[in-house]
Amino acid sequence: MKRGISVLANLKITMGSEVFQNPIWVASGTFGYGTEAPELVDVNRLGAIVTKSITRKPREGNPPPRIVETPSGMINSIGLANIGVKKYIQDMLPVYENLTTKIIVNIAGTDVQEYVEIMEMMESVSSVIAGYEINISCPNVKKGGMEFGVDCDMTEKLTEKLRVLTERLLIMKLLSLIHI
């Protein structure tokens, strides 16, 4: 390298058919919808934004306190607060058309049908979405509040139903089954 000239490494990664400019992604729930704090980071320098969860209907989430600091870190229980899929499509998708970074939409549901309906709505309107992260750590109301990710058969059924709806990247957000 000559003095005064810097060479940037190629950090591109490929997942499925999508090529991301780098492996730096913001995780779902940590960065809102990716547009809330432009003064903090130029989102176009990120590999991807994984949005906060989207549900069929808007949700207020859990009452405060939602975040608690502990000596070992932080615990959060947001409760999937979000604007709902219709408002998301109306308000957020047009904003993403002006970004160069990839958008991964996190989808949450209470049963298989809700996940299917949300993905069908997204697929019918959006060309700016690179893929989906399917939040299966949500309680499955039709199974008595059990989380999808604890039931391998339900996880398989959900994955199969969603895979046929899209050719985009499909990421299953698994929950930890390890008890410490």
Where are these regions (language model features)?
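N-terminal capping/small domains of soluble enzymes
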Residues: 2-103, 108-109
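Active-site-adjacent beta->alpha loops and helix N-cap segments on the catalytic face
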Residues: 89, 141-162, 166
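Catalytic beta/alpha-barrel core
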Residues: 135, 147-154, 169-176
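Conserved small/polar residues in nucleotide/adenosyl-binding loops
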Residues: 178-180
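Conserved radical SAM core fold
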Residues: 55-60, 136-145
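Short, electropositive alpha-helical surface patch
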Residues: 103-128
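Non-membrane alpha-helical structural segments and their capping/turn regions in soluble enzymes
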Residues: 82-86, 112, 116, 149-156
